[in-house]
Amino acid sequence: MEIKERIIETLRSTQRENIETVITYMENHHFFDRGCHNHHIYDGGLADHAWQTYELAKQLEAENKRRHPNVPLLDSASLAICALLHDFCDCSGMRHIKGHGYRSAMMLKELGFHLSQDEFLAIRFHMSLKNHEDHPLSENARQSHLRFVVHKADHESANMYRGSKI
């Protein structure tokens, strides 16, 4: 199965309202054809990065469960949505724009796709909290395990394949 089909199937499996609108937007705005701006710089790199981030996030969560068996697992739909859509705004060609996590979350909202507060924080702050210490949501984001997992998986994916195709 191609990455595109895996991503679409996984997003559909979340059974979230308006997920078809999000998928249609992804297809019509080249999510599956574009490269990332800083890593995965090749046609289809954005989709590859999204899928790798998702796979790494699942691995991180499994490792967390192994180390801390009494801690509840993250919601699988939330993990899929945040890992696969954290760079959603890149499909519109908006590269090198500061605040792309915020833009991604807002674009999803504009499409009528509801994000929980934790999902919003995970997408909004997936890059880092380093430059956001004074942001009113920074403490909530800092405490979000979902945000931490997406951030770490995104960072690992970007560093694993910087400039090369998988």
Residues covered by each model-derived region:
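Metal-dependent phosphohydrolase cores
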Residues: 1-166
